[in-house]
A protein has these predicted regions:
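N-terminal helical cap/lid subdomain that shapes the substrate entry/recognition surface
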Residues: 1-61, 65, 80-81
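Asp-based, Mg2+/Mn2+-dependent phosphohydrolase catalytic module
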Residues: 31-32, 57, 61, 67-189
């Protein structure tokens, strides 16, 4: 998408990425801030650009054996259908999407809806998220255990406020899976 945004300009891919990292480290919406900085126009989101991280399916398979898994997402209508297309809906027990609920992260109500649907107590829940502002902060505000996964567009963010500090930080889904399954003393195979 970066190449699409900078097409026809004199801005290089490297310049865009460098500025994006700069904004991410300030915990700002890096894509939007970079686009504004360069005076560019945001392109439409293409659902066909959505991809799973390479270790997603394997991690979900392992975790689903021992845990109820839910997704809280700021997504348009059709979240379950997209998860089905990716072949992962069968590993997801609860899907709470903003377009269907009329409330979006970071509003704490969306987390409460997910907990209620999952039949899960707050002290039994773990929020795994890639964004500090939309995932970690609101989950911390309601007292949920938090794991920041430094993957995707927000991997370069730098927690500076107390509420931005996660209980655990992992680099990818494989590491997350390993850390969560370790206390169970299971091989995960």
């Amino acid at each position: 998408r970066i190449r699409e945004v900078i097409e026809g300009t004199e801005i290089t891919f490297e310049q865009f990425v460098e500025k994006k990292i700069f904004f991410a480290k300030q915990n700002k919406p890096a894509d939007l801030e970079t686009i504004k900085f360069f005076g560019l126009t945001k392109t439409s989101w293409h659902k066909e650009d959505e991809r799973l991280f390479p270790d997603t399916i394997e991690c979900l398979k392992k975790l689903h054996r021992y845990y109820k898994i839910g997704i809280i997402a700021n997504q348009s209508l059709g979240s379950k259908e997209r998860l089905e297309t990716f072949g992962i809906l069968k590993y997801i027990d609860v899907v709470v999407a903003s377009a269907e609920e009329g409330v979006a992260k970071p509003d704490k109500r969306i987390f409460e809806i997910a907990l209620q649907r999952a039949g899960c107590k707050l002290e039994e829940a773990v929020m795994v998220g890639d964004r500090l502002d939309n995932d970690i902060v609101p989950a911390n505000e309601i007292g949920m255990y938090t794991i920041w996964i430094k993957q995707g567009n927000w991997k370069d963010a730098c927690p500076t406020e107390e509420l931005e500090q996660s209980d655990m930080t992992v680099e990818n889904l494989s590491e997350l899976c390993e850390m969560i399954l370790l206390p169970l003393d299971v091989s995960g195979n």
